């Protein structure tokens, strides 16, 4: 609660989950900051915009879905970030582990996962949900030095439909695909307090209906969402200037043999990431992270396992 540092500001007060108050450091070696006191409030994007409307804050980080709304006394600043949104697709068939449902019989087929990825029109989603303020995301590390551009694809619903046909999911009389009497259905979860992810989930569901998948959405609290994501898609938010994002999402855990947030395992992918962490050469480690994404024969991209979109 009393960190020692040499930066422009010192921690004056920290109310966990509510706010942080910073004061200018009189001993700072450089030019003194013009703002002598900064209060940072912890609030979600919707609450931040409400604070703007009420004139309670000077600056707010909020959702792009509010970008088309004007507020007197405020101007819009669009910043490029590595922040991204996406969803998991459980990559193993249904099973039970320690009393928890794990896996999904529909998304465990790699052809289905590839079809879903091809069916998503990211540009359309940016316009519909984010008012044009965004860029297509193909991984959790777009634009980073360790990003493998082989992850990039173009929306192709004809090819998506062909892949589903190949996987045995045939369009029925009601327009919904079936296989062995089972409907092609998916429920997309989103954090109940996140309006942007709710809208992204709804847009995703609507797009997948175009290829015969009966998709729906449901809000969930984080007290249950982590467990539910072991067997169905959940809209996640990622973005960090570290390749550990890849490790945390895709590397299998020793106790379960599967990745932490959604069931998936690939020993070759694990090995590349382990070698990257053990490397004492930064540039060489980046190449290993890239190979974990796609090495020409396996990985986590469209031509590989594609367990996240």
What is each model feature region?
Residues 3, 8-129, 145-176, 180-304:
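Extracytoplasmic/periplasmic ligand-capture domains
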Residues 118, 137-139:
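Short helix- or helix-capping micro-motifs
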């Amino acid at each position: 609660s009393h960190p020692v540092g040499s930066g422009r500001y010192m921690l004056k007060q920290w109310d966990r989950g509510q706010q942080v108050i910073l004061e200018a450091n009189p001993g700072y070696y450089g030019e003194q900051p013009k703002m002598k006191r900064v209060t940072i409030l912890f609030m979600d994007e919707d609450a931040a915009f409400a604070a703007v409307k009420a004139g309670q804050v000077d600056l707010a980080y909020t959702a792009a879905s509010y970008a088309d709304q004007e507020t007197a006394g405020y101007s819009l600043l669009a910043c490029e970030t590595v922040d991204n949104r996406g969803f998991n697709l459980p990559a193993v068939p249904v099973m039970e582990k320690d009393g928890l449902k794990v896996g999904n019989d529909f998304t465990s087929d790699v052809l289905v996962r590839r079809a879903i990825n091809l069916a998503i029109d990211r540009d359309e989603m940016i316009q519909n949900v984010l008012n044009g303020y965004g860029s297509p995301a193909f991984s959790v590390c777009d634009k980073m030095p360790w990003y493998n551009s082989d992850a990039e694809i173009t929306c192709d619903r004809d090819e998506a439909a062909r892949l589903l046909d190949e996987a045995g999911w045939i369009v029925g009389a009601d327009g919904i695909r079936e296989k062995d009497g089972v409907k092609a259905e998916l429920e997309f979860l989103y954090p109940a307090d996140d309006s942007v992810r709710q809208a992204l989930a709804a847009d995703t569901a609507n797009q997948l209906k175009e290829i015969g998948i009966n998709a729906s959405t449901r809000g969930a609290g984080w007290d249950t969402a982590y467990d539910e994501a072991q067997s169905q898609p959940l809209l996640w938010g990622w973005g960090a200037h570290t390749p550990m994002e890849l490790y945390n999402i895709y590397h299998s855990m020793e106790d379960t043999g599967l990745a932490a947030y959604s069931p998936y395992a690939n020993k070759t992918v694990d090995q590349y990431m382990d070698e990257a962490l053990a490397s004492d050469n930064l540039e060489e480690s980046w190449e290993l992270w890239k190979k974990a994404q796609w090495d020409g024969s396996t990985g986590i991209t469209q031509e590989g396992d594609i367990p996240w979109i």
